[in-house]
């Protein structure tokens, strides 16, 4: 009965989170996972060499493969919309699971009030809701790593169950490989594991499974086992992203602040300092995980990969748990101990700061809701043009101003992403050209403030108006 109640509770939380933000959209990377999964489902190798392709995450592509029946189904002139809706549903469920795991960890490490506060903090952070509503793989990745921590907290040196969860996480984000390696080294210090070499070798194999599977997937598709590394570095250069270890000291704290905001950082500092000083047996696992996650982040930056805020969601979740400890950890100190009173005063200061910033947090979530509604409306207008046939097989190829709409139109039109032309890569000479109706639509939907080029490509010569709506204009040149 408990699993059923838990499942029902998670679904309820997912629905509540959806109601809070109002909409769900599938981001660029996950749309490619759906396209590539459909390719595999139809017996074709995915095309990882398409311009500005995202990093192929094996587990995300596998889910895309499992969703092939939905991504291949056409309804009212749109193909694959069912797969996109399923991805959004899974994304909100992942958010709910993340909140539950954060609660359980806070409860296990400290107490129930700390766990509740930590979960509330995580599920009310605007960036967390944003990444969740857009179906980024980073949310389930963090949930899996924290799930492994929860298993280890309840069953110290659990071994295979922890490594199994980390292996799944390692097929979404390579940072999990470091956690698996560190965990195996820690297990090897145990006399029981050293005595049973066969078991230890099995655990080493499990820890190595994620990187080996990732390398094998890249090799099978591209012939280059390091494609994800080299391709991601190349894309980071093309998009002008910040990379390099030298940028980590300035960027990481700022990005953590953008995720959590000042009161939570203050509470996390209080909780980390006091719990490590006075409740170190409870706090050490979280502290070690937080440090390892920052080391992993630094390694990625050193390897030339982009320094993105969503790569810091794991340490942000750990800090949220320490913020819960900052507010309520004093309850674990024996009565009559002077430390209890000092911590309680510090906890009261944390609580006051959190409450004082509630209006600002509500405003941020409201702004996110408005942004998602605007982008959903623009995307609905684009879908309407596909349904009406204004964009489709009648006049191909389809071209767009930049790479942003490519994977979505490829999904909807049931074509390869390479068959949708980005005008930033090459100027189309025939077919259909789809462009935003105005600058507001361009800024809201296809332009990114981080991109080096923030200009919408003009309509190619020889293309004439052929339709449109409030958000988009279609131009055609269908001659041979």
What are these regions (language model features)?
Residues 187-188, 257-287, 292-295:
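Hydrophobic, aromatic-rich transmembrane alpha-helices
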Residues 8-13, 118, 122, 208, ...:
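Transmembrane alpha-helix segments characteristic
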Residues 6-9, 164, 204-212, 267-271, ...:
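Signature aromatic-anchored transmembrane alpha helix within multi-pass, membrane-resident enzymes
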Residues 346-407, 412:
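Membrane-embedded, lumen/periplasm-facing catalytic core of multi-pass transferases
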Residues 18-28, 43-70, 74-77, 396-399:
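Membrane-proximal lumenal/periplasmic loop motifs of glycosylation machinery
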Residues 28, 55, 87-94, 117-147, ...:
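Multi-pass, polyprenyl lipid-linked donor-dependent membrane glycosyltransferases
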Residues 86-109:
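Transmembrane-helix motifs of polytopic, lipid-linked glycan transferases
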Residues 197-271, 295, 352-367:
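Membrane-lumen/periplasm interface segments of specific transmembrane helices
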